[in-house]
């Protein structure tokens, strides 16, 4: 199938994937709402046939209802390590350690000596660029305070966003996903992000969430860790993570030491989709490219339906 005029090239689709794509494209929005089963089945077929690799797992939600549209994940309710996808919730817990919310600090990242993945460091970091560039040093500083004195705040955030409580013996590295002890079921994690970007809290917390949204928007731009997600109508919110691989039940085996994850929410200002993708044996930054292609398939169907 040829690319849409004016769009970047799309991957060729199999016959079954192409049929599902056309079914979605030709289905009016009213029909999708009246027959959600047909819409979800067509979307599932399109994504599975267009992205058949067993190394790619995903959860696609309707951002407004938090209902699952499509899913390919061996055990979607089993908790898994999610790496840096925990960072926004640690930031929320940090802000809730006082009332009014705490001010976020400026942290100087020197690189590996500060526990960061970027060997040369990020330099002076505040919340928004630290989230966009996933600076470990910055979030380790927040998490250290949360681990030592913010247990109640973290429990409130976990309960509000329906995340499992972290283990009792908390460390800063665990809270930001550097080590794999705090694990989250994939579907629950996608729903927590939907709640995060659509929540309507009090004015003080709305300001904090607004900064988190800005950081996730910048993550998808050049220089951000999710920049490979590409350009999309209305832009996107994104957060990457690279998590230690833990072999799962059955035939789930590690292909490398780590797995790449990315959460993509689109469009940024009026979210329609929440897409969580995990790709085995790579980084979150690389997985963002796969997620971007999946999102493009969804967007193409919407463009044709208009």
Regions found by a protein language model. Give the residues of each.
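Beta-lactamase-like hydrolase cores
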Residues: 32-73, 151
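Conserved catalytic neighborhood of penicillin-recognizing serine enzymes
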Residues: 100-155, 160-167, 177-178, 198
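A penicillin-recognizing enzyme superfamily signal
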Residues: 152, 182-298
